[in-house]
């Protein structure tokens, strides 16, 4: 939710929408003629440049997505760009793209009678009586009016608006806050009501992290819900990017990325996926260059278990991950969005661009970001590798937020601290369920890891606070997690997931075995040196773990049932000369046998 800090530009309020724009008149913006000290606020290079229209993010099933269609500070270079970064290059805006048809259908199903292509409804124009019969009582305090003095409106979206306010009394008397006002008349479906309820619950649970605005409380009366939060007065990250001519230096980009990754890692550890990360959804607390960055707009966020996949298509087109468009995603989708942000920070253009949303989606699914154009050849190889590993189209090969903070480009920065990573527990669960043969293969692979690759694993092992003899058990894991747990972690059922690590209840694991259990084969595969890793690991496996094995025995070790055509699936896993695992079989064993492999036969 955007905690906006400036009034809407009244000069645009009476302008008509751009042709074919799905936005209401009040939010379609023509080129501004205003200037500061005689200079145009927007950087222009041609007669057509400087025209800034609100970007229309693809349709969301949650009205909360539109609550904070932010109006940027009056002297910002992005004054007239209300909901998006402009065009491919940050100096050249373009008209809003058309919505994608299949996403219109999603919105239609979600909002019932509301037509998706007319969902951008100006405030106050919704039909009377929407949502009649729905229970719109949230159980929030009804004392908002007695505690706060509501001030000027500072931002407006399709389903709500934001006001500045201040405490009327108490120790905080006179202190300014941001209040997100959500009219209950806009809550026309049970899903919309539940979205608001979940947003408040998540904000309440996560509040307290350095890179999240402080959550004060939520209130309601007969007409509205009021969410009271810290007022961030430094403007959007988008504004800072534009004020710097469209890009950051590597060092400054690192400072921004560390803060973004810290809060994303925290959310993911708690089992919360944001689903709408973009420069507009990060605010600075003040105008100072060194001010803290805060993640906002949790209107689309949701709980997700480590072994769960979501299927709602939500977010903003330029930042959406490929797997979101495929309707099967988890926390990795947020990391893709972070990758798009850092790409923009370093070069000033978007990695995926088209003039229509369907074109953007095609680019996201099929195109590779360019690292050939300036300034990429002049940037460090570590910076390029960092961005590439966040923008891997295979979510299994993408870095997590904690791993990104362990990357050589970032890890030596003073503020970079590696947080606990929920991925470790997913990988440990798979390892504990593996056959003895696969465990031996993973142990061989773990012995080929480089110092940089081991850095992340050492940090994760240390966070589990091993005993004096250097081992961990299930109790170490539970204890370490509980120290960082919020109510969100309970709601995402992560403690329940840990029950699947019960094999550690009666045994302990040393660091060497932990490396085998917690390494990601898919992520190693994404490296240029993967072939070298695999060959070296196979040589070790030949000496320490490989043995003659019958196909039926191998099938049993892999847990394949009688319905699986094991000879068809596994025939090329074994060497015909001695019946031992071939190199191909070894690599496949590292991954295990997936249902996709079985179906292929």
Swiss-Prot record:
Ca(2+) 1 binds at residues 467, 469, 471, 476. Residues 1-55, 70-98 are annotated as: Disordered. A lipid is attached at residue 2 (N-myristoyl glycine). Residues 1-19, 36-48 have a biased composition (Polar residues). Coiled coil: none annotated. Activated by calcium and calmodulin. Autophosphorylation may play an important role in the regulation of the kinase activity. It comes from the Eukaryota. Ca(2+) 4 binds at residues 578, 580. ATP binds at residues 154-162, 180. One of its GO terms (molecular function) is ATP binding. Ca(2+) 2 binds at residues 508, 513. Its EC number is 2.7.11.1. Residues 148-410 form the Protein kinase domain. It catalyses: L-seryl-[protein] + ATP = O-phospho-L-seryl-[protein] + ADP + H(+); L-threonyl-[protein] + ATP = O-phospho-L-threonyl-[protein] + ADP + H(+). Ca(2+) 3 binds at residues 546, 553. It holds the Pfam family Pkinase. It is found in: Membrane. One of its GO terms (cellular component) is membrane. Gene3D superfamilies: EF-hand, Phosphorylase Kinase, domain 1, Transferase(Phosphotransferase) domain 1. Residues 452-488, 489-524, 525-564, 567-596 form the EF-hand domain. There are 3 contiguous domains conserved in the CDPK subfamily: a kinase domain, an autoinhibitory (junction) domain and a calmodulin-like domain. The autoinhibitory domain (415-445) inactivates kinase activity under calcium-free conditions. Binds calmodulin (CaM) in a calcium-dependent manner. May play a role in signal transduction pathways that involve calcium as a second messenger. This is CDPK-related kinase 5. The gene is CRK5.
């Amino acid at each position: 939710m955007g905690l906006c800090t400036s009034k809407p530009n009244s000069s645009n309020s009476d302008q008509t929408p751009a042709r074919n724009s799905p936005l209401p008149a009040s939010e379609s913006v023509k080129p501004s003629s205003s200037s500061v000290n005689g200079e145009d606020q927007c950087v222009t290079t041609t007669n057509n440049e400087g025209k800034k229209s609100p970007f229309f993010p693809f349709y969301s099933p949650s009205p909360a997505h539109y609550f904070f269609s932010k109006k940027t500070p009056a002297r910002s270079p992005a004054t007239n760009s209300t909901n998006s970064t402009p065009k491919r290059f940050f100096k050249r805006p373009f008209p809003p793209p058309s919505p994608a048809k299949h996403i219109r259908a999603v919105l239609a199903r979600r909002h019932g009678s509301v037509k998706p292509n007319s969902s951008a409804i100006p405030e106050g124009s919704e039909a009377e009586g929407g949502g009649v019969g729905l229970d719109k009582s949230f159980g929030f305090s009804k004392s908002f009016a007695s505690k706060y003095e509501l001030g000027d409106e500072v931002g407006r979206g399709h389903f709500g608006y934001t006001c500045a306010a201040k405490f009327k009394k108490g120790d905080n008397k006179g202190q300014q806050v941001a209040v997100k006002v959500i009219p209950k008349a806009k809550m026309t479906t049970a899903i919309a009501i539940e979205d608001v309820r979940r947003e408040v619950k998540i904000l309440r649970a996560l509040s307290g992290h350095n890179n999240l605005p402080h959550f004060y409380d939520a209130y309601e009366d007969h007409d509205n819900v009021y969410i009271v939060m810290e007022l961030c007065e430094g403007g959007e990250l988008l504004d800072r990017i534009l004020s710097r001519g469209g890009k950051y230096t590597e060092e400054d980009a690192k400072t921004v990325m560390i803060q973004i990754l810290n809060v994303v890692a925290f959310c993911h550890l708690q089992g919360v996926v944001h689903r709408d990360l973009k420069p507009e959804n990060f605010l600075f607390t003040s105008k100072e260059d060194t001010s803290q960055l805060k993640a906002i707009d949790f209107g689309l966020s949701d709980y997700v278990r480590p072994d769960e996949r979501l299927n709602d298509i939500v977010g903003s087109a330029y930042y959406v991950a490929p797997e979101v468009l495929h309707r099967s995603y988890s926390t990795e989708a947020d990391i893709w969005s972070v990758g798009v942000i850092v790409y923009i920070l370093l070069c000033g253009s978007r990695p995926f661009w088209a003039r229509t949303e369907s074109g953007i989606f095609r680019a996201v699914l099929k195109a590779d970001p360019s690292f050939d154009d300036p300034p990429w050849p002049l940037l460090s190889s570590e910076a390029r590798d960092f961005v590439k590993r966040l923008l891997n189209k295979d979510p299994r090969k993408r870095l997590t937020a904690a791993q990104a903070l362990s990357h050589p480009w970032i890890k030596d920065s003073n503020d970079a601290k590696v947080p606990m990573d929920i991925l470790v527990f997913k990988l440990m669960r798979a390892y504990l369920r593996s056959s003895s043969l696969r465990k031996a293969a993973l142990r061989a692979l773990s012995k080929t890891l480089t110092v940089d690759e081991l850095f992340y694993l050492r940090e994760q092992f240390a966070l589990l606070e091993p005993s004096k003899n250097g081992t961990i058990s299930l109790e170490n894991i539970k204890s370490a997690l509980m120290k960082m747990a919020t109510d969100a972690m309970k709601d995402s059922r992560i403690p329940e997931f840990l029950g699947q690590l019960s094999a550690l209840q009666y045994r302990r694991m040393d660091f060497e075995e932990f490396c085998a259990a917690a390494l990601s084969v898919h992520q190693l595969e994404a490296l240029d040196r993967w072939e070298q890793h695999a060959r070296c690991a196979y040589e070790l496996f030949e000496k320490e773990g490989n043995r003659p094995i019958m196909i039926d025995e191998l099938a049993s070790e892999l847990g394949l049932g009688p319905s699986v055509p094991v000879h068809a699936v596994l025939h090329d896993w074994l060497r015909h000369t001695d019946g031992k695992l071939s190199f191909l079989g070894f690599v496949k064993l590292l991954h295990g046998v997936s249902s996709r492999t079985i179906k292929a036969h």
